[in-house]
Amino acid sequence: MPQKIVVVGAGPVGSLAALYAAVRGHDVEIYELRSDLRNSEHSSNISQSINLALSERGINSLRKTGLPDLADAVLAETFPMHGRMIHVRKHGQYVRQAQAYDAHGRNLLAMDRTGLNKTLLDHLNSMPNVTFFFHRKLVSVDFRKKLAWFENRTKTDPAKSDDIEVSFDLMIGADGAHSAVRYHLMKFVPMSYQQEYIDKLWCQFHVPPSDKGDFRIPPNYLHIWPQDDAMFIALPNLDKSFTSTLFLTRSGFEELVASGKVVEYFDEKFPGVVPELITEDELRKQFNEHDHFPLISIKCSPYHFGSTGVIVGDSAHAMVPFYGQGMNAGLEDVRVLFEILDKYPGDQAKALSEYSEQRTPDAQTINDLALGNYREMASDVKKPLYLLRKWIEEKLYIYVPSAGWATQYSRVTFSNMRYSEVQAAAQRQAKILNGIVGVTTLSLIGSAALWLGRTGGLQQAKQNILRSICLLAQQAQKVTKG
């Protein structure tokens, strides 16, 4: 039976939730605090956001809407990234090192968040059972009476701000990390809540195309300048520019603001950026004019109340951007939610309860993995032991497929396996991998004399490593299949 579904938040996650509901024949109303981002007047307010890395979970959620052209329309606006490109100095020389994302050649897709949002909104706009309400601020909700009150904040008539009463059968909160829906949900359900601002701020920079209209650096990579307590990244855009982001401690930003030595800092920490990618004047200008945003991590539980309210995306589990899964996880929330709602067509309360029970451990797992992945991106990627472990894992992935071996990264990024199950599998694999790394390290040491003493020694070392992997494959199979 068709219901009235109110979605609060018209970002990508809220828009996808509205599409899933509309395709099922429900009457959908979307309430958004801001103006319609498709209007030119809004463009100046949305220019700063960390670019998306769209991966399998997000793509799968787009395909499962029931709209055959949606995923293709989104994918047409993406740019493939084969792996990471690490920018470092070695022995005083600036070098770039490519690290593939996947042993089987699968890619991440760089995408502008606003472009994704516009595509979703355009599809919603063509559906007769969907109504938009922009400049509407949620001020109160009664989830028992199924009533909500919104303040009309239209710019055309600021004085006209009387609250508007709205009824609903189900409210879906997709209104971000500082969610008003979550705030009001807490009044009806004993919700556990944890919020953490990590000691990192971020600032966006724009790298324009070259004078010849081409990319300034190889385009099919996520470029990383790792510096332990700081990191600079760059993602490609379709117009051959890059969207770049500086991550730095709060005190680090304060020191740069006070000293004004942002160019000197980049020269020291991030080789090849100034003036090759950004001129000195433009770097100073963007650093001073662009906001320095905080990074927040949020966990809460449960995600619902009875049969009438549920939260998705950042409203439920805001995470730091270091695994590239925030948006993908939010889109996956929508798919999982509606699959469970379809499972219990006559019992919405049971469906929402199962959604909270299933999705909470998964969301909290990727939240933790995202926090931990900063170290990998900003530090580990330049260390020999990390590269050795990565090489071994990829060889196991290729040569022992019967063991079900896969890297944690590939399972997170290129599969739809539950995040909590990914972590459990990774922990089982780590037990055997630690042993393989130990054997491999001894093999490397034992082969060092051969490598130094005669031609072919390095190849012999690699053969010894692969032999060690094969000998341990049977044990790996037992462990990973648990």
From Swiss-Prot:
Pathway: Cofactor biosynthesis; NAD(+) biosynthesis; quinolinate from L-kynurenine: step 1/3
Superkingdom classification of source: Eukaryota
MF terms (GO), sorted A to Z: FAD binding; kynurenine 3-monooxygenase activity
SUPFAM superfamilies according to UniProt: FAD/NAD(P)-binding domain
InterPro entries per UniProt: FAD-bd (IPR002938), FAD/NAD-bd_sf (IPR036188), Kynurenine_monooxygenase (IPR027545)
UniProt KW NADP keyword: yes
Cofactor(s) recorded in Swiss-Prot or TrEMBL: FAD
Function: Catalyzes the hydroxylation of L-kynurenine (L-Kyn) to form 3-hydroxy-L-kynurenine (L-3OHKyn). Required for synthesis of quinolinic acid.
Family: Belongs to the aromatic-ring hydroxylase family. KMO subfamily.
Full protein name: Kynurenine 3-monooxygenase
Organism whose genome encodes this protein: Phaeosphaeria nodorum (strain SN15 / ATCC MYA-4574 / FGSC 10173)
Gene: BNA4
